[in-house]
A protein has these predicted regions:
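Flexible, non-catalytic linker and terminal segments flanking ANL/adenylate-forming cores
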Residues: 1-12
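Conserved AMP-binding/adenylate-forming core of the ANL superfamily
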Residues: 28-82, 99-104, 154-162
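Short hydrophobic/charged patches on amphipathic alpha-helices used for structural packing
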Residues: 17, 53, 103-104, 177-180
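Structural core segment of the AMP-binding/adenylate-forming
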Residues: 86-164
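AMP-dependent adenylate-forming
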Residues: 15-40, 146-147
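Conserved pre-ATP/AMP-binding loop-to-beta segment of ANL
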Residues: 24-25, 155-156, 163-187
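Domain-wide signal for the mature, well-folded portions of proteins, strongly enriched
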Residues: 30-32, 69, 136, 141, ...
């Protein structure tokens, strides 16, 4: 991997972003869809992570705020993880097998501000306990299957969430790299 000139790569976000730029169209990961492996490039990985980080920042994520992810391993999990870290937040995984009571404990113990749910099953758990989670600001759902008629001011789809990041990127094209550069190796 070729290091970008004049950039000290001393944090995970900087290493990630350097990889995105230097590896561009190379395969970053693969996901099986209906039995067929789909390739995801570093460019796509980077863009989704960037939009995620920008959306989190726009919605009020501050340095060291916690973002919890209740999902099986999937590309969206990785986009959210890198977007969170790049925006200065802390990423926290929640097992999909955890009960609603366990989710409540984890969300409260970590002071989670943003909660990503893989699907309706994971959404139901956080909805059951959210009134007892005072720090929770926003719930984002990756897969809205079965939720087309569902409306709640605290819940948005990942697709809608990414549009917030797209708008932020258009308004402030240098914001993402600024956020990455504000993350320190001591964080």
């Amino acid at each position: 991997m070729e290091k970008e000139k004049n950039v000290e790569i001393n944090t995970i976000p900087k290493l990630f972003w350097n990889s995105v730029k230097s590896r561009a169209d190379r395969v970053a990961m693969r996901e099986k869809d209906l039995g067929i492996w789909q390739e995801i490039s570093w460019t796509v990985y980077g863009e989704k992570a960037k939009l995620t980080g920008l959306a989190l920042h726009t919605l009020g994520l501050k340095k060291d705020d916690v973002v919890s992810i209740a999902s099986e391993g999937m590309p969206e999990w990785l986009y959210t993880d890198m977007g969170t870290i790049g925006a200065g937040g802390i990423s926290s995984g929640i097992y999909t097998t955890d009960s609603a009571e366990q989710v409540k404990y984890l969300v409260n113990d970590s002071s989670t501000k943003f909660y990503f749910a893989e699907n309706e099953e994971q959404l139901d758990k956080i909805l059951e306990v959210r009134s007892e989670c005072p720090t929770l600001k926003q719930i984002i759902v990756f897969d809205m299957e079965g939720l087309n008629e569902f409306h709640d001011d605290q819940v948005i789809s990942y697709e809608e969430f990414l549009k917030i990041g797209e708008k932020a990127n258009l308004e402030k094209p240098d914001l993402w790299e600024s956020l990455i550069n504000n993350v320190n190796s001591s964080d």
